[in-house]
Amino acid sequence: MNKPVFFRRPFKYTYFNATLILVVINVVVFFLTYFNRNLQYSLSLNVYYVLNYKMFWQFFTYMFVHGGFTHLFFNMFGLLIFGIAVERVIGSKEFLLFYLLCGVISGAFSFVVYLLTGSARVVLMGASGAIYSVLFAYAVCYPNSRVFIWGFLPIRSPVLVMIYTIIEIVEQLFTYSNVAHLTHLFGFVAAFLYFIIRMGINPIKVWKNVLHKDNPNREQSNDNEDL
């Protein structure tokens, strides 16, 4: 797998499979909190707890807590599929920083919205915000890649991000569920800011270049990876 030519890395490149380490940590925390609900509440992000009990560590720990096996499975599946590919491009240290920081930022942004809208009893848990950031990063690292939806429908990775953005906005505005659509959107926002500020890359320009040059007759670039 070749890295995109436009990429620069602030950290010296290292690789030690940080993605797998994150998966293991998530699984361990899941079983610890599954049998100890008090621990689950202490680690999940709760506006009320943060404001009244100063439990600021929740901005970090919430992304390792999951409410059920299905929640855990799909998040870890997404992390493995997209995380390994991104980590190979930016290196393990950068990937860890990216994943953890984006998870904190997406949770913090959600916290502010919940606070301003009077939703102090909302409990936020799960790696979804960070996973959406990883999906965004995949679309930047592999803009020519096609992701196969339902196993047969190929969609360019940048287009997939756009589709998910629309879906999450619609779900947030017009439906009611216990899914943190707002945090998913903030995961995209956090990743966008990370690439702009930390990596010096404008994802919009990257995607525009790819989509404008998208011609079935042209030679494909060396950053293709189909999933």
Language-model-detected regions and their locations in the chain:
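Transmembrane helix-loop-helix
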Residues: 7, 14, 18-21, 34, ...
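Hydrophobic alpha-helical transmembrane segments of polytopic
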Residues: 18-26, 99-102, 157-160, 164
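Helical transmembrane-bundle signal
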Residues: 26, 30, 106-107, 161, ...
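Alpha-helical transmembrane segments of multi-pass membrane proteins
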Residues: 27-41
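Extracytosolic (periplasmic/ER-lumenal) interhelical loops and adjacent juxtamembrane/interface segments
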Residues: 39-64
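Alpha-helical transmembrane bundle and helix-membrane interface signal
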Residues: 88-89, 141-153, 199-207
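Multi-pass alpha-helical transmembrane bundles in non-GPCR membrane proteins
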Residues: 135-168
